[in-house]
Amino acid sequence: MNEFMKKFSLTKPIIQAPMAGGITKPRLASAVSNQGALGSLASGYLTPDLLEQQIKEIFELTDAPFQINVFVPLGLEMPPKDQIKKWKENIPLANQVNQFTSVQEEWDDFYQKIDLILKYKVKACSFTFDLPPEDAVKELKTAGCCLIGTASTVEEALLMEERGMDIVVLQGSEAGGHRGAFLPSKGESAVGLMALIPQAADALSVPVIAAGGMIDHRGVKAALTLGAQGVQIGSAFLICHESNAHPVHKQKILEANEADTKLTTLFSGKEARGIVNKWMEENEQFETQTLPYPYQNTLTKAMRQKASLQNNHDQMSLWAGQGIRSLTEEISVKQLLNQLCQEDIKI
Amino acid sequence: MNEFMKKFSLTKPIIQAPMAGGITKPRLASAVSNQGALGSLASGYLTPDLLEQQIKEIFELTDAPFQINVFVPLGLEMPPKDQIKKWKENIPLANQVNQFTSVQEEWDDFYQKIDLILKYKVKACSFTFDLPPEDAVKELKTAGCCLIGTASTVEEALLMEERGMDIVVLQGSEAGGHRGAFLPSKGESAVGLMALIPQAADALSVPVIAAGGMIDHRGVKAALTLGAQGVQIGSAFLICHESNAHPVHKQKILEANEADTKLTTLFSGKEARGIVNKWMEENEQFETQTLPYPYQNTLTKAMRQKASLQNNHDQMSLWAGQGIRSLTEEISVKQLLNQLCQEDIKI
């Protein structure tokens, strides 16, 4: 049992990725935690009230540790009006948006969620999109909460460690969904795990967790061989029975292959990997002109919601990683965890 | 000893990547082969005469098997004159180019190289850029030459197997230098090895070799765990004493980190991963407008040659993979192979 597993008394070195947008709910997270891996709630798009409801619910379903993931606000100011106008004209239903969440409101939301994590003594809190602010880090650490940061390069991972993270999740280029990259880089900040894990493991003192493209025991063993202490799995949990992902999203993952995904900013303004669909194809030439997160995200919200209601994959965000060729049937969390940890893993 | 190692009586499951452009010469390839791994000559930018010279030379230096890599011509017709004119105006010294190699000349060059491989009974021939033509495959196989194809997706790997390849090299997104992708894909055809290896190993019957971002024994072990029978290493051999790479290229790799590289078409017209430099930065907005290979390559040749002569990294192609943070000193091929196969690898 390594340091990461010891922290949570895990029997499996697996984290279920905190997939926001309604995919991850207490049912999925508790099923994972009850099997000896670390389940996750994703608070990113939840109001504090809804998060509190989910926390209460998960405590009914499991006594085992779980984590809550929080988006760190980027604090980017409103883009120029003409850019907003252009996108409002281009994105279906975007003209319904009358105002955006202010930076202050984003931070209020963030701190209300931190307060809930403290109030309910949640065992672990993970951060995505940026370094968490020092005051939140201090409060959570004082309360004994284990802190998990997300990094896509060694430089980012080192900053996360310096900020007080107890564990750093390394997001490989293979990973589906939003990228956690927060530093400018000279080249591509999306680095394959085969290269990223050993370079980060050598540089950091805290345990690193590998995220991206792994779907079975071979990936888990390879990541541990490369120096990770655990593996974070997204797409493979997304298609589980217990996951609340949209049936069309699940179906698209079951059908898709490894070269069907790409990184796009067209849905949210922040780079994320998803299965290419009509919205991405039709707007490819505008990839570099999207509004920064969360503005683009706010404008595409009604379009995505309508697409969900109509089971229309053309305008949904079909987040998925590069391991999806091997995902061909919906199984249970228990079955998946058995595939991931088929035999004893020596660590 | 697995099937791949048996084919060449190797003691180490390692291929030295065939890096064209003067990096890989008989000295490097023979040093690798003499240590029980598979050395490679890169015929891509050599004339048949120069290739023959290198073949004679390597036979003086080793009795062990080695391979020769051949570029498969893409056969793309000349781009429109106005596009050529635009690039001639933009690329330093490009106005020296009066004519391009014709598609027929490219094929003549290809078949002359195949004839040399047959004449000298070279043990293995690898192909990059496309499926090799059926007549060449047939001739080489009849002569007992082991054929190695390059693929970046499972679909490409399956086509390579179908075409008669005995081994398929899976080029992960981590890999430096030119991408071997040859099929259009819905999303990104650059897939991380962590996802690519198991998906391809499950689909293919012939041995697969992993290429990209690996620099030490952890990467080798992880690749074998994922289902590869061997590992192809580029950047780490490029900086070896025995490599003929430009000293500035070596130095840049020794200094660079994992997020300093990106895929670019600006040097050759074909996507390749290299350390970001001034030429790439200044022309970033033209990435999607480059001429197809080999036309862009022909136009940048004089610029690159002058940059090499002047030790000017701003206009050289600094090909490198994503594992380069860990490469910090020039070592010998023997030292590198000991790092890659530190202990016995059970396969």
Swiss-Prot record, chains A, B:
Binding positions for FMN per the UniProt entry: N69, Q171, G176, G213, Q232, I233, G234, S235
Q: Which CDD domains match?
A: NPD_like
Q: Which Pfam families match?
A: NMO
GO molecular function (one)? nitronate monooxygenase activity
Q: Which UniProt keywords apply?
A: Detoxification, Flavoprotein, FMN, Monooxygenase, Nucleotide-binding, Oxidoreductase
Query: Is the Oxidoreductase keyword given for this protein?
Result: yes
| Source taxon at top rank | Bacteria
What this protein needs as a cofactor is:
FMN
A Gene Ontology biological process annotation? response to toxic substance
Reactions listed under catalytic activity:
3 propionate 3-nitronate + 3 O2 + H2O = 3 3-oxopropanoate + 2 nitrate + nitrite + H2O2 + 3 H(+)
Report the protein's function.
Nitronate monooxygenase that uses molecular oxygen to catalyze the oxidative denitrification of alkyl nitronates. Acts on propionate 3-nitronate (P3N), the presumed physiological substrate. Probably functions in the detoxification of P3N, a metabolic poison produced by plants and fungi as a defense mechanism.
Q: Which family does it belong to?
A: Belongs to the nitronate monooxygenase family. NMO class I subfamily.
List the PANTHER family: NITRONATE MONOOXYGENASE-RELATED
According to UniProt, the name of this protein is Probable nitronate monooxygenase
Protein species of origin: Bacillus subtilis (strain 168)
